[in-house]
Amino acid sequence: MNLFTPGPVNISVAAQQAIGRPRMFHHRSDQFRTMMTKLTSHLKNAFMTGGEVLTLTSSGTGAMEAAVSNLLSPGDRVLVPVSGKFSRRWAEICEAYGIDVIRTDLEPGDAPDADVIISALEADPEIHSVLLTHCETSTGSLTDLEPVCAAISHLEQASGREILKIADCITSLYVDELRMDDWGIDCAVAASQKGLLSPPGLAFVALGKRALDRLESNSSSAYYFDLWRYLRRKPPFTPAIPLVDATLASLEYLAGLGPEAVWQAGRSGAAALRLLAGAAEMKPVARRQASGVVAFWTEGLDTAKIGRALEREHYIIVAQGQAELKGRILRASPIGKSPAMLRGFATAFSGVLAKTGRTLDMDSIRAEFDRLLEDCAIWE
């Protein structure tokens, strides 16, 4: 089955081989400690941080909850720009912990820019943290974190406030450009099943100096997600050892390719999918578009029927719209997809659309499509 979903994605050959190895370590053994040390080193390089990166056995939402429960306290006031299902999740987690959430609601496909963020922060001096979503997976929109974080830092310097910058990078790590330290991100969270080309089940919390300082001064109500436990003893509980093995193997593979080549493959793969959608007269949902997922409006089409046909006839799975976008959009991801996979998707998508009466004019885009696929050859 070819997963064109924005997570889980098809895992790398390196991860497959690691899972297939008939070995198991005890989580207190020297062998496993060595494995965790290597994993953490690669994760620091992936986030581009000199801070701490902690590995949890959970989904990405677990990393989000760990960040909230350890860095924030009941009654704290935070800003959450909401542009879709996953940015809304930040707000829902915060509210579950008794945190006072100031929401900035955006239209589907929009992403918060520096002006929106700064306006909200200036209007309320009690806000001391901003929870951002790098890639809003429900719409494919990308928040430009570099200028947003720079604007927040400038406001901090001018006002004397400390405003923690916390980012969901679950669909952007090793997909879109991410430079945690250079951009001034204090805490970033991610998971194994997307850009790391690994099975689901591991989540990561990257902490810069200011986040570590906040962690030290904050009283957490968490137990399993108490990050001090992970800092003192890595890991504090029995981890998913085969997943650590597989994710380390995949990170070593990605490191060999280099982040710039991986980011470019993501950009070009996403552009190729947008080209296909455009040739079928489908418009993108996002104004500023991420590489990890391409979402496009499907006006006049039965999205569920298209999804079923792709799966049953071509063994390709795409994602439907969620919440208020259900039945209105389709979502596809180019993460880890080779030129052959993308060409196969183009053929299948064109054939399925033709049965609905919608034409995908492949001849008009073939030259540009093939040019974009050259950058995706790293996945062959």
Task: State each model region's role.
Residues 112-174:
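Active-site phosphate-binding strand-loop segment of PLP-dependent enzymes
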Residues 295-300, 317-347:
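Conserved PLP-binding active-site segment of the aspartate aminotransferase-like
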